[in-house]
Amino acid sequence: MAVFMERPNGDGWAHLVSDLHGETGRVELRAFLKVIGVRRPLHRAHTYAEHCDIRGTEINRARNAGAELISWRELARLLRKKRHTENSVSKSQRLLSRP
């Protein structure tokens, strides 16, 4: 239940992600983007790697709004965890839907 921001790269861009998977994470990320005044579509929407690229003053607004700053390695770990969670949920849903 947090929004994380990868440390900005040399070009001044950063990735903003939610730690929650699925629709819950998507809603959290979109709500956060609305708070900081960013209106652009999410990249890789509906996947574990769903994120938004932000830059310049958007980065400052994200930090001021409470985004937790993480390294690219921490971001990779977070995305792997989300992928594992989504795969587990999908498998459970398939098993439950069998006749």
What are these model-predicted stretches?
Residues 1-98:
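Catalytic phosphate/metal-binding cores of nucleic-acid and nucleotide-processing enzymes, i.e., regions
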